[in-house]
Swiss-Prot record:
Alphabetical list of PANTHER family matching this protein: T-BOX PROTEIN 30_42-RELATED, T-BOX PROTEIN-RELATED
Gene: tbx-30
Record InterPro entries: p53-like_TF_DNA-bd_sf, T-box_DNA-bd, T-box_sf, TF_T-box, TF_T-box_CS
Organism field: Caenorhabditis elegans
Disulfide bonds: none
Keyword Kinase (UniProt): no
Protein name: Putative T-box protein 30/42
One Pfam family it belongs to: T-box
Transmembrane portions of the chain: none
Residue ranges of DNA binding: 11-192
Molecular-function annotations in GO: DNA-binding transcription factor activity, RNA polymerase II-specific; RNA polymerase II cis-regulatory region sequence-specific DNA binding
């Protein structure tokens, strides 16, 4: 790399992060994986245009402190609870693979598929990071030049994008703020002072359109005990736990009344389901020009042993 060139990395949606800095919260729990919003997106400059780079994202704890909301409704170190021990670091490579420097600088580098959870089991997925609630995390981008083969990597801690994983929003306005910016966001605020769709009437607000709809009843079905059979004149489909099989009654390979009439289906001469007396490994009958089918009429072949 040219010594005079310095790589610069910024959050492309930095203004959004600044609105909640340094008190950004992200919903995370052990039951499911949840997205990060604002999303993790970068603008990069200072790369060598014709060099190829690999980009790796990680989420790191900024310190070994457990936090909580103080009397001023701000995040502060908690004196009541001890911090959780550090967990293993995870690295997530950019989904689009390696790219040239000029390509990376011309676009917004996105890690929008990243998810977080407090379940170690769910975090086994490639794009899911395991986090501890009530601790402070920061996205870290690592950039390495593969063309020059340099050992040293450029590491960028994006402190503007630090956040606290929480099971429910600790700040009353966080859920509303995210919902206004992102239609996929849920409220999830704590009960004291938080804005919830269920209590919008009690709070003196008009109920949202979503909450005014009548609940839709859904039948609970155990897929492990359900077999769906759809019969037509051409096929029978059996569906059990999403396993789909097709049954063709007219085929000699599958039809019980025909399976002993034809040693093989003309279009699959070496099929392993050939019944006795012809062994699947014995192909001599196939190359025998005098061979005749067990059928009263050899309707499957012409005189040159080619299937009709």
């Amino acid at each position: 790399m040219n010594p005079s060139t310095q790589i610069v990395v910024k959050m492309s949606n930095e203004e959004l992060w600044k609105e909640r800095y340094p008190n950004m919260e992200m919903i995370s729990n052990s039951k499911r994986i949840t997205p990060i919003f604002p999303e993790i997106k970068f603008k990069i400059s200072g790369l060598e245009e014709n060099s190829r780079y690999v980009l790796v994202l990680s989420l790191e704890k900024m310190d070994n402190i457990r936090y909580g909301i103080n009397e001023n409704k701000e995040w502060a170190p908690s004196s009541a609870r001890k911090p959780k021990p550090h967990h293993n670091m995870k690295f997530f490579f950019h989904p689009e693979g390696t790219k040239l420097g000029k390509e990376l600088m011309a676009e917004t580098v996105e890690f929008t598929s990243v998810r977080i959870t407090t379940s170690e089991k769910l975090s086994e997925k490639e794009n899911v990071f395991y986090v501890h609630t009530m601790h402070k995390y920061v996205p870290v981008l690592t950039i390495r030049n593969l063309t020059t083969g340099e050992i040293a990597s450029n590491i960028f801690k994006m402190e503007i994008a630090q956040f606290f994983p929480v099971s429910i929003y600790q700040q009353a306005s966080m859920g509303r703020w995210k919902s206004d910016l992102n239609k996929h966001s849920t409220f999830g605020n704590r009960s004291e002072g938080g804005i919830k769709r269920k209590t919008s009437d009690a709070a003196g607000q008009l109920p949202s359109k979503r909450s005014s709809k009548k609940p839709v009843k859904k039948d609970v079905v155990d897929n492990s005990e359900v077999t769906l059979e759809v019969k037509t004149s051409q096929y029978l489909v059996n569906q059990n736990e999403s396993n789909l099989t097709e049954y063709i009654p007219s085929s000699p390979l599958y039809s019980s009344q025909n399976q002993y009439q034809y040693p093989f289906h003309p279009y699959s001469p070496f099929d392993s389901s050939i019944p006795y007396p012809y062994s699947p490994m014995d192909y001599s009958y196939y190359f025998n020009p005098t061979f005749q089918s067990f059928s009263p009429e050899n309707v499957y072949f012409d005189e040159n042993r080619n299937p009709h």
